[in-house]
Amino acid sequence: MILDVREADELKEGKIDGAVNIPLGRLIRKARHGDIDDLKRKKIITYCNSGYRGNIAADELNKQGFDTVTIEGGYSAWKDYGNKKEG
């Protein structure tokens, strides 16, 4: 599962094909309250625009027992490599 942790206004730049948007603050709250525990069965990839928030999200989710990695360099790096995107 690919999680885009950017804010809604950042999505106008596009997003990775198939990614689900949950802004970082909301994602952390949901993880801490057990609202997304069903995702613990999945491998999760997080990203933001530059990688900073994606790393925070991955670290927090890993602390909560999720199997999470981040895309180094975020969406900017993803686009630079010519990968598939929506928008």
Name each region found by the language model.
Residues 1, 8-45, 49-87:
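Rhodanese-like catalytic fold shared by cysteine-dependent sulfurtransferases
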